[in-house]
C-alpha cells in the first residue's frame, strides 16, 4: 500500500514511472509491483483513497474550522441557515467554541454580520431549545433578531442591580433598579440614586427620551404590611407628634398621640370631634380616650413603625396588685365613664415604642411593641425582644 501511495505521488508530480527507472534484473519484483500500480484504474482508486484520508485527517484535526476560505464560504452559502440547528453540526462544535459567542447588543449596526471567529451560530442541547423559544416569542414581523430589544442586568455596585433594554436604534433603556434590603433602606436607596443618576445614564448610554426618570421605589416585601411608605420616626422629646394619628378602638372610641411635657394641652380634632385634655407627666407619652363622630383613616400610621405582630400573644400579661398604684401616675380626663380602657405609648429606648393598656380594676396589659425600621431590622428586633422581655414586663406591668 505504501509503495502504491509513493507511486501515485511520483506520477502526479510528473516523474517517470517506476517501471522506467528499474532497469536492473535484480529489481524485478519491485518493477512488477510498480507495473501494477501504474495501471489507470488502480491509479484513480489510489488518488480517491488518498484524498479521502486527507479529508478525514483535516476534519479530525479541526483545520477546516480555522480555514479562512472555508469560513467565508460557509458564512455566505445559502445552506448556512439550514445548518444552523442541524444536530450533527451542533454536536461537532466543541464546548469551548460556544463561549466565543459574542453578545450582539442592539445599536451595533443591524446589517453588519460578525465573522465566524467572533461568534458561533451553533448551540447544543438545552441552549438550542432556549434560543428557538426566544426566537418564537421575541422575533419581529420579518423574523430578524437584530431589531429586538434585548434585556440585560448590570451590577453597578454590591446591592444595586439595574436592568437595561438594548434598543434597536442604539443605546439602552432603563427598565428596573433593584436594591438589596440588607445594604440599603428606602432613604439610602433614594439618596444613592439621586447621587449616581447622571453617572449611570452616561456610563451605560441610557437614552433619556426627554422624560424625567422617577426615583426608584423601595423593593417590595412579601408581607403586605411592609409595603406602606415608612416615614422617619421623629424624636419624641423635641417635636410634637401629629394629632391626626389615631387608632380605632372598640366601641367607636379612638386614641391619639398626646404632646410630651405638656400639662393641659387642648386641641381640636376636626369637625364632629370632641375636644380633649391631655395631662401627662414629664417624659411620658399618653393616650387619651375620646368619642368621635367619624372614624379617621388608619393609613396615616400604618407604616409609621414596623409592628411585630407575632409577639402580641407572648407579651400579654397582667400586673400584680402591688402595682395598681402606678396606674394613677397618668391623669387622663375621660369623656365617657370612668371605667373606660386607656392606652398610652412609652418609649423604652430610641426606636422602641411600647403600647400599654390600662384595663378596669387597675390591670395593665402590654398591647404591642413597635420598632423603628431605621434602627432595627426584623432579626435585630426579635433578638432585642428576647433579651428585654422580662425587663419590660417588670418595668411597665
From Swiss-Prot:
Keyword Repeat: yes
Region feature (Disordered): 14-37, 105-148, 212-278, 300-342
Domain BRX: 150-205, 342-397
Cysteine pairings via disulfide bonds: none
Keywords: Nucleus, Repeat
GO cellular-component term (any): nucleus
Comp. bias regions, Low complexity: 309-320
Lyase keyword on record: no
Pfam families: BRX, BRX_N
Compositionally biased intervals (Acidic residues): 124-148
Record's compositionally biased regions (Basic and acidic residues): 220-230
Annotated localization: Nucleus
UniProt xrefs under PANTHER family: PROTEIN BREVIS RADIX-LIKE 1, PROTEIN BREVIS RADIX-LIKE 3
Family the UniProt entry places it in: Belongs to the BRX family.
Protein name: Protein Brevis radix-like 1
Organism: Oryza sativa subsp. japonica (Rice)
Amino acid at each position: 500500500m505504501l509503495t502504491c501511495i509513493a507511486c501515485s505521488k511520483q506520477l502526479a508530480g510528473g516523474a517517470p514511472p517506476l517501471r522506467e527507472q528499474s532497469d536492473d534484473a535484480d529489481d524485478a519484483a519491485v518493477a512488477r509491483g510498480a507495473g501494477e500500480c501504474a495501471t489507470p484504474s488502480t491509479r484513480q482508486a489510489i488518488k480517491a483513497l488518498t484524498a479521502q484520508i486527507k479529508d478525514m485527517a483535516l476534519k479530525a484535526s479541526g483545520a477546516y474550522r480555522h480555514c479562512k476560505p472555508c469560513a467565508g464560504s460557509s458564512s455566505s452559502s445559502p445552506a448556512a441557515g439550514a445548518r444552523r440547528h442541524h444536530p450533527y453540526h451542533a454536536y461537532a462544535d466543541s464546548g469551548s467554541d460556544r463561549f466565543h459567542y459574542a453578545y450582539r447588543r442592539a445599536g451595533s449596526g443591524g446589517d453588519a454580520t460578525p465573522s465566524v471567529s467572533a461568534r458561533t451560530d451553533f448551540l447544543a442541547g438545552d441552549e438550542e431549545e432556549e434560543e428557538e423559544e426566544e426566537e418564537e416569542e421575541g422575533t419581529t414581523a420579518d423574523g430578524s433578531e437584530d431589531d429586538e430589544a434585548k434585556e440585560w442586568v448590570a451590577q453597578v455596585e454590591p446591592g444595586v442591580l439595574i436592568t437595561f433594554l438594548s434598543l434597536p436604534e442604539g443605546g439602552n433603556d432603563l427598565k428596573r433598579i433593584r436594591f438589596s434590603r440588607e445594604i440599603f433602606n428606602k432613604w439610602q436607596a433614594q439618596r444613592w440614586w439621586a447621587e449616581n443618576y447622571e453617572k449611570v445614564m452616561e456610563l451605560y448610554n441610557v437614552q433619556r427620551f426627554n422624560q424625567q426618570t422617577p426615583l426608584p421605589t423601595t423593593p417590595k416585601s412579601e408581607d403586605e404590611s411592609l409595603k406602606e411608605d415608612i416615614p422617619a420616626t421623629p424624636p419624641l422629646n423635641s417635636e410634637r407628634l401629629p394629632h391626626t394619628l389615631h387608632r380605632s378602638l372598640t366601641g367607636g372610641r379612638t386614641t391619639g398621640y398626646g404632646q410630651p411635657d405638656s400639662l393641659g394641652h387642648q386641641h381640636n380634632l376636626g369637625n364632629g370631634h370632641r375636644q380633649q385634655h391631655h395631662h401627662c407627666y414629664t417624659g411620658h407619652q399618653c393616650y387619651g380616650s375620646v368619642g368621635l363622630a367619624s372614624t379617621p383613616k388608619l393609613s396615616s400610621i400604618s407604616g409609621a413603625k414596623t409592628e411585630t405582630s407575632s409577639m402580641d400573644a407572648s407579651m400579654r400579661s397582667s400586673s400584680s396588685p402591688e402595682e395598681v398604684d402606678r396606674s394613677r401616675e397618668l391623669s387622663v380626663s375621660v369623656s365617657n365613664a370612668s371605667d373606660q380602657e386607656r392606652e398610652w405609648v412609652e418609649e423604652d429606648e430610641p426606636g422602641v415604642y411600647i403600647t400599654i393598656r390600662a384595663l378596669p380594676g387597675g390591670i395593665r396589659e402590654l398591647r404591642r411593641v413597635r420598632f423603628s425600621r431605621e434602627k432595627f431590622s426584623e432579626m435585630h428586633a426579635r433578638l432585642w425582644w428576647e433579651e428585654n422581655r422580662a425587663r419590660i414586663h417588670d418595668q411597665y406591668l
